[in-house]
Structure formats: C-alpha cells, structure tokens
C-alpha cells in the first residue's frame, strides 16, 4: 500500500512529465508550499538555471507580512516572482503546481503572477 508521500510524489512526477511534453521549452513557474511559507521559482529546464525566485522569507516581504502561510503571502510572492521574471526577460511560462491542488494559496499565487505580467 502506498503512503501519502508516495502518492504525492507520483502526482508531482506525472504533472512534471506532462509539462515537459506540452511545455515546448518554456520556463516553468514552480511552486513549493510548506506549513509556514511559500516559495516560487521560474526555472529554465533546458539550460538548467533558475531565472527568478521569490519566497515569503524574502527581506522585502518579511516586514509586510504577518505570516508566510496565508493567501496574502501567496499574493505577495506571486507579484514579486512575476516582477523579477519580467525583469529577467521572461513573460511566457508553464505553471508547475507540483502535487498541490489549484486552490487556496496556490491559486492566489498563480493569479497574482498573472496580474504581475506572466502569461500561462
């Protein structure tokens, strides 16, 4: 019988495979959510480089946020990663939600990144 971690890993790998197949070489906006913080990176898999990154632990956001674990923090991180990606010359990405459902903090981050100038 599979554990919860095994099932989560299988979901993540299945989604990553689909993104690689349909992504067409576009950078991916990868999201990691922990119990206390949220992290986002724009990754160029072809070159193997991180083009832009932001998290609720960034000094620019830490003073503004009450906690890094709510939707307000996700919105702030989404806007910041979009701003940094556009500054790096990236506007078209593929959204990699990992094994997480598109709901709550993940959805808030995605919508804020769209408002910030990223298209996916």
Swiss-Prot record:
Example GO biological process term? translation
DNA repair as UniProt keyword = no
Q: Which InterPro entries match?
A: Ribosomal_uL18_bac-type, Ribosomal_uL18_bac/euk
The protein's UniProt keywords, in alphabetical order, are:
Ribonucleoprotein, Ribosomal protein, RNA-binding, rRNA-binding
**CDD domains found in the cross-reference section:** Ribosomal_L18_L5e
Pfam families in UniProt: Ribosomal_L18p (PF00861)
Q: Can you tell which superkingdom this protein's organism belongs to?
A: Bacteria
Cellular component per GO, a single term: cytosolic large ribosomal subunit
Gene3D superfamilies according to UniProt: 3.30.420.100
Name a GO molecular-function annotation: 5S rRNA binding
**Belongs to which family?**
Belongs to the universal ribosomal protein uL18 family.
- What interactions and quaternary structure are annotated? Part of the 50S ribosomal subunit; part of the 5S rRNA/L5/L18/L25 subcomplex. Contacts the 5S and 23S rRNAs.
* Primary role: This is one of the proteins that bind and probably mediate the attachment of the 5S RNA into the large ribosomal subunit, where it forms part of the central protuberance.
**Name listed for the protein in its UniProt record:** Large ribosomal subunit protein uL18
Species in which this protein is naturally found: Gluconacetobacter diazotrophicus (strain ATCC 49037 / DSM 5601 / CCUG 37298 / CIP 103539 / LMG 7603 / PAl5)
């Amino acid at each position: 019988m599979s554990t919860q971690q095994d099932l989560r890993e299988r979901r993540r790998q299945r989604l990553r495979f689909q993104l690689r197949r349909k992504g067409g070489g576009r950078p991916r906006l990868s999201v990691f959510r922990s119990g206390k913080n949220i992290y986002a990176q724009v990754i160029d898999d072809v070159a193997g480089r991180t083009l832009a990154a932001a998290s609720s632990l960034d000094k620019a956001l830490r003073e503004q946020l009450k906690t890094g674990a709510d939707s307000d923090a996700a919105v702030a991180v989404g806007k910041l990663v979009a701003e940094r990606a556009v500054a790096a010359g990236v506007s078209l990405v593929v959204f990699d939600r990992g094994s997480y459902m598109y709901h709550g903090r993940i959805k808030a981050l995605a919508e804020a990144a769209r408002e910030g100038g990223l298209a996916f």
